[in-house]
């Protein structure tokens, strides 16, 4: 079985990191802001040190630094998780590219409350950079646009997990 843990205080990087080290979750589900705060408070200060900046420019040594940062970040997330699932807003491209570069086990999904909530997802090993995955099982997804190359379209979803309507609220349905 699984347990769901909620913070009882407003999240700050310190409070989040403390909770993760105590709970040692198997799966972490978070909004991008939380992950970005952890990156800015834990990872970025290390990467901005002059010696580290130099090492990151040297082929081979850069990978040693990335592996060390990855290990430290995994331990900061409790050390026992399978992957971090990020969703609820756009993920910072700089942070996403860095996490991908160091092979950090994360994935970005897309969903909405009306779809209970996952629409797209992919295993972190298969996820493409700047993607939010593939359609979840038994979901059909399409983008409806008058001119797909020039006009942003509407995301349309069909599947068994899409709600039929809002409970006792026909006007909102």
Locations of regions flagged by a protein language model:
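Conserved AMP-binding/adenylate-forming
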Residues: 28, 65-173
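Conserved AMP-binding/adenylation subdomain of ANL enzymes
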Residues: 1-72
């Amino acid at each position: 079985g699984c347990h769901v843990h909620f913070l009882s205080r407003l999240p700050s990087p310190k409070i989040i990191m403390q909770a993760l080290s105590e709970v040692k979750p198997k799966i972490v589900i978070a909004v991008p802001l939380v992950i970005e705060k952890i990156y800015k408070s834990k990872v970025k200060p290390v990467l901005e040190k002059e010696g580290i900046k130099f090492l990151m420019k040297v082929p081979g040594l850069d990978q040693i630094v990335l592996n060390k940062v990855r290990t430290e970040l995994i331990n900061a997330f409790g050390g026992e998780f399978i992957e971090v699932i990020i969703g609820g807003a756009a993920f910072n491209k700089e942070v996403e590219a860095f996490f991908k570069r160091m092979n950090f086990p994360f994935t970005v999904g897309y969903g909405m409350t009306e779809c209970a909530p996952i629409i797209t997802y992919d295993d972190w090993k298969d996820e493409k950079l700047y993607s939010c995955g593939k359609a979840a099982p038994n979901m059909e997804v399409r983008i409806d646009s008058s001119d797909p190359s020039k006009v942003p379209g509407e995301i349309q979803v069909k599947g068994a997990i899409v709600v039929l309507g809002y409970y006792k609220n026909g006007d909102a349905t």
